[in-house]
């Protein structure tokens, strides 16, 4: 009982805060620019992928028509078939490279945004005198008592 009393007195002085980082990030100008840059890259990569797919389809149809007419000598047919296989492999490789490039672009664009957010969280936490700031967007917390935990998402200091 005596041990519980000091803990109870100490617990009353603790301040906790919470934010929703996703709400904060989506209104940052840096986020809008990053999203636009990523969408532009995606459009370019998609256009190139579509162009190579159309080129492959055209050559494949020409090959099929030549085979159907039986107008190709065997060695030319083999060479064209090999060209088609090479085109398919290059296209698959390009698709994999494009996915990796998109993931890297996303990470590169978002890293400074998350750093800025984390720095702002630290500054707001220090200014508000809270012990912890929980991010409800990154870590689901089943219950938040709004009277005991300060919602810092729309912090008046506008550090976010």
Predicted regions and their residues:
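Amphipathic, charged alpha-helical segments and their helix-to-coil junctions
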Residues: 11-160
